[in-house]
UniProtKB/Swiss-Prot annotation:
HAMAP family named in the record: Ribosomal_uL24_B
Role: One of two assembly initiator proteins, it binds directly to the 5'-end of the 23S rRNA, where it nucleates assembly of the 50S subunit.
UniProt xrefs under PANTHER family: MITOCHONDRIAL RIBOSOMAL PROTEIN L24
UniProt GO MF annotations: rRNA binding; structural constituent of ribosome
Source species of the chain: Wigglesworthia glossinidia brevipalpis
Keyword Membrane on entry: no
Protein known as: Large ribosomal subunit protein uL24
Gene name of the encoded protein: rplX
Positions of region (Disordered): 41-61
This protein's GO CC annotations: ribonucleoprotein complex; ribosome
């Protein structure tokens, strides 16, 4: 089955702390979550390890967010949109529901 949201899609967060922010999908997990560029960032504290020659400090890490909380972002309308599928000449395409344009 084809997925409606794929890697490198421009998305917008619909609910929660980051509502209204946009970003690109970096990684999608099988449990229905995704890592989105610049969204849901947490700070991790790490001690230095002299054996591995790694310095310690505070590092920022992007955490997964549920795909049910995001929607694909339509650049033409500047709004979140829904996705539907269309088959032309034996090929399946994803298109925006509002204006019928193909998703790149």
């Amino acid at each position: 089955m084809s997925k409606k949201i794929k890697l490198n899609d421009e998305i917008i967060v619909r609910v929660g702390k980051y509502k209204g922010k946009t970003g690109k999908i970096k990684k999608i997990f099988s449990d229905g979550k995704a890592i989105i560029e610049g969204i849901n960032i947490s700070k991790k504290h790490k001690k230095p390890t002299p054996n591995e020659k790694q310095s310690g400090g505070i590092f920022e890490k992007e955490q997964p967010i549920s795909l049910s909380n995001v929607a694909i972002f339509n650049i033409d309308t500047n709004k979140p949109d829904k996705v539907k599928f269309k088959i032309e000449k034996g090929k399946k395409y994803r298109i925006f529901k509002s204006n019928g344009k193909k998703i790149k």
